[in-house]
Amino acid sequence: MPLKGSHPNRAKVVRGVFEGAYNYMKSGQLLRQVINKVNGIDFNNLADRKHFGDVYEQLLNDLQSAGNAGEYYTPRGVTSFMVERIDPRPGESLLDTSGGTGGFITCSIRHMRERYVKTVADEQAMQGSLGLIEKKPLPYILCVTNMLLHGIEDPSFVRHDNTLARPYRDYGPGDQVKIILTNCPFGGQEEDGIQDNFPAQFRTRETADLFLALFIRLLQPGGRAGVVLPDGTLFGEGVKTRLKQQLLAECNLHTIVRLPNSVFKPYASIGTNLLFFEK
C-alpha cells in the first residue's frame, strides 16, 4: 500500500546520492538513449511500478553473475530465509549495518506487506522503522534507487557512512534496535584507527569481528538478530573467543546454519554461517 504524493526529502536524497560519485558513460548517444527510455516510464502507474523493484533486483543479480557487484549482493534465497526466520513486523526498528544494495531491507518490506501491512498507518509504521548504513558509494547509490523502486517515499534512512567509525561507547540505548538483519563484510580488515573505537578486549582489524561486537551492543533487550558471519569468527581464538563469550553471556544464540562454500563464489570462498540470536 504505497503512500501517495512526493516527499519533501526526495530532492535532498537525490543530491546526497550523487555526492562524491564519479561514474560516467563515454558515449553521449548511449546516455541520451538511456535517458529517453527512463523518461518514457510512468512511475506513477502503480500497475507498472510494482514490478520495478523485482526487475531492479534481477539486474543486481545479473551484475553479481557478471562478477561486477558480488561484494554488494547477498543471494535472494539467503535473504528470504533469514527474513522468514526473523519475521519483522511494522513498527519494529530494523537495521542493516552494512546494507549493500538493500536486499535485506527490500525483502523485509515484501515480507511485511504480504503479511502485516493492511492500512496506510501500517505502511507508515513500517517505513518509519527502517535503518540502513552503507560505506561504499556505488552500493549506496544502488540501494537508494532500490528503495525508491520498492515504493519507499523517503529513503533518507539509507545513510552513506561507516558504521564502525563511530566509537563503540557512543552507541547508547537510544541507538538500540529491535531487529538486526545483515551480511557484514568478511575477509577484509579495517583501516588504522578504527579498532581504537572499541574496548581493548575487542580490538582487532578484522571487520566481521568488530561488527559482531557492535551487534551485541545495538540489539535491544528482547531484540532478535540474523547475521552472516565467517568461520573464523566462530572458531578462531583470542578476540574471537572473547566475542563468543560476550555473545553467549548477553544473548541466546539458538540457531547456526552452515552455508555451502559455493554461496558467495567467486567473490569469496570462505566458509560462512547464519547466526540467529536474541538478547
In which residue ranges do the predicted regions lie?
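Extracellular loop and loop/strand-boundary signature of outer-membrane beta-barrel proteins
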Residues: 199-200
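Conserved S-adenosyl-L-methionine
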Residues: 71-179, 187-189, 195-196, 205, ...
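Short glycine-dipeptide loop
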Residues: 219-225
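Class I S-adenosyl-L-methionine
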Residues: 252-279
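Non-catalytic, mostly N-terminal accessory regions of nucleic-acid modification and defense proteins
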Residues: 1-90, 155-165, 258-263
